Swiss-Prot record:
It is found in: Cell membrane. This is Phosphonates import ATP-binding protein PhnC. GO terms for molecular function: ABC-type phosphonate transporter activity; ATP binding; ATP hydrolysis activity. ATP binds at residues 42-49. The gene is phnC. Part of the ABC transporter complex PhnCDE involved in phosphonates import. Responsible for energy coupling to the transport system. It comes from Lactobacillus gasseri (strain ATCC 33323 / DSM 20243 / BCRC 14619 / CIP 102991 / JCM 1131 / KCTC 3163 / NCIMB 11718 / NCTC 13722 / AM63). Gene3D superfamilies: P-loop containing nucleotide triphosphate hydrolases. The keyword Kinase does not apply. It catalyses: phosphonate(out) + ATP + H2O = phosphonate(in) + ADP + phosphate + H(+). The keyword Nucleotide-binding applies. It comes from the Bacteria. It is a peripheral membrane protein. Belongs to the ABC transporter superfamily. Phosphonates importer (TC 3.A.1.9.1) family. NCBIfam families: ABC_phnC (TIGR02315).
Length: 261
């Protein structure tokens, strides 16, 4: 029987090297517990997106093992892999909505993993799941847009539809890859508030890549700094100074804004 205090996400000596030799991740060892709200910060190209995409196995790692609630997603196949992924919700910078479909239909895709393909192809969702989708839209204040086409919404509204889709999926984990990168400051804070709501009210573990240090400070409970594919800082947000953020981004060399190779 698995220990009750096992990490929700565990990376053991994980590395990712791309075909062209670029190092995406190098010797990552990381535990994230159930219910944490973790923000990952670092320069563009530091490895933040590679980290999240590896956790959900959107890309395979070159070395090491990744466990989701005690189960290896690295070695999982077929039904086992699908069941693990069902517990992981993804939120992307580009929203990943079907633009010509209604808001409701987009939110219902959060339930796809619970159905055989032929049922979702013909939109044969149960009344219970349609109710779940509607209630999720209520939580993000978009119930009045239920039959609106996704491409008629603003960027902020589209991202909130993506959050409602994740809520309908009811995962244990949410991975948010730069969820506010294309949004204005006010809308960004609203999206982060919605993610915090999923974390606090539903107990979902959230790992979010953020380019905004201010948003990271406001919403994160724990901060992980990534530079050149390695974790260079891991600590409580309440104990993390501005000097630490400066070091994560500048590498202690004083060259602010320097891009990764």
């Amino acid at each position: 029987m698995a220990a009750t205090n096992q990490p929700m996400i565990q990376l053991k000596d994980v590395s990712k090297i791309y075909d062209n030799g670029t190092v995406g991740l190098k010797d990552i060892n990381l535990n994230i517990d159930k219910g944490e709200f973790v923000v990952v910060v670092g320069l563009s190209g530091a490895g933040k997106s590679t980290l999240l995409r590896s956790i959900n196995r959107l890309q395979d790692v070159s070395k090491g093992d990744i466990l989701i609630d005690g189960k290896s997603i690295t070695s999982a196949k077929g039904k086992d892999l699908r069941e693990i992924r069902r517990d992981i919700g993804m939120i992307f910078q580009s929203f990943n909505l079907v633009k010509r479909s209604s808001v409701l239909r987009n939110v219902l895709t959060g339930r796809v993993a619970y159905y055989p393909t032929w049922k979702t192809t013909f939109n044969l969702f149960t009344k219970e799941d349609k109710q779940k989708a509607y209630e999720a839209l209520q939580r993000v204040d978009l119930a009045d847009k239920v039959y609106t086409r996704a491409d008629q919404l603003s960027g902020g509204q589209q991202q909130r539809v993506a959050i409602a889709r994740v809520l309908t999926q009811n995962p244990k984990i949410i991975l948010a890859d730069e969820p506010t990168a294309s949004l204005d400051p006010q809308t960004s804070r609203r999206v982060m508030h919605d993610l915090k709501m999923l974390n606090e009210e539903y107990g979902m573990t959230v790992v979010a890549n953020l380019h905004s240090v201010e948003l990271a400070k406001e919403f994160g409970d724990r901060v992980i700094g990534v530079r050149a594919g390695q974790i260079v800082y891991d600590g409580k947000m309440s104990e993390t100074s501005q000097a630490v953020f400066d070091d994560i981004y500048n590498g202690g060399n004083g060259k602010k804004g320097e891009e990764d190779a």
